[in-house]
Amino acid sequence: MSLGLVGRKVGMTRIFADDGRSIPVTVLDVSDNKVTQIKTPEADGYSAVQVAFGKRRASRVVKPIAGHLAKAGVEPSRVLKEFRVEPEGLASLKAGDQVSVEIFSVGQKVDVTGVSIGKGFSGPIKRHNFSSNRASHGNSVSHNSPGSIGMAQDPGRVFPGKRMAGQYGAVQRTTLGLEVVRVDAERQLLLVKGAVPGAKGGDVVVRPAIKA
C-alpha cells in the first residue's frame, strides 16, 4: 500500500543508454496531482490519500464534488483517485499539497493502469485469436465463423463465458513491473520502459509495483 499518481499518457519515444542501447519508453505527464482528502483509521476506518488530477471547467463539476474540492483548496478537477497507504505515511501530507513525480526513482518498478484502446465490435478471430475455417473445398459463407458454440438439447444453452464475437478493447488493464527510466522533476514527467495500456491522451494510474 503506497502512494501513487494519476497521469496522462503523452505517447511513446525512445532514449539512448550510455552504452548506446535504444530503450523504448512511454512518457507520462503526472503534473498537478493535488491531495484532496486524508482518510484516517479513526475517522474512516482505513488510511488512504485521495488525489485530484486534470483541470475541468467549474460548470462541468457537480456541486458535491465542487464543494469537496473547494474545501481542500483545489481547483475543479477531472479525476479523483484514492490510494491506500500505511498510517505512518499520512503524517507528511495534508489537503491541498501537491504530490511530486519525485516519489518515484530511476530503476524503480511500477504498475500502470489504463483503459485499453477500443476496437469496436469484433469477430472471434480478431477478438480471441481463433483460427479461420477453410477458404474453399466445401466451405460456404462460414470462413470466419467461430464453429460450434454449444451441444445438443441437453444442456440446450450456451454456457456463460463462451468466447464469441463482441466488444473488443475499451477495458481497464494493468501492466505490471515496468521500469522507471527517467524522472523529470522540472516538467513532472515520468518515463517508463515499454508500453502502457490506452491511447495517447488517456488517463493512467501509476503505483509502486505490487510484485517488486
Swiss-Prot record:
It comes from the Bacteria. Methylated by PrmB. The modification N5-methylglutamine is found at Q153. The keyword Ribosomal protein applies. Keywords: Methylation, Ribonucleoprotein, Ribosomal protein, RNA-binding, rRNA-binding. Gene3D superfamilies: 3.30.160.810, Translation factors (2.40.30.10). One of its GO terms (biological process) is translation. Disulfide bonds: none annotated. One of its GO terms (cellular component) is cytosolic large ribosomal subunit. It holds the Pfam family Ribosomal_L3. One of its GO terms (molecular function) is structural constituent of ribosome. The keyword Chaperone does not apply. Part of the 50S ribosomal subunit. Forms a cluster with proteins L14 and L19. Belongs to the universal ribosomal protein uL3 family. One of the primary rRNA binding proteins, it binds directly near the 3'-end of the 23S rRNA, where it nucleates assembly of the 50S subunit. This is Large ribosomal subunit protein uL3. It comes from Azoarcus sp. (strain BH72). The lineage of its organism: Bacteria, Pseudomonadati, Pseudomonadota, Betaproteobacteria, Rhodocyclales.
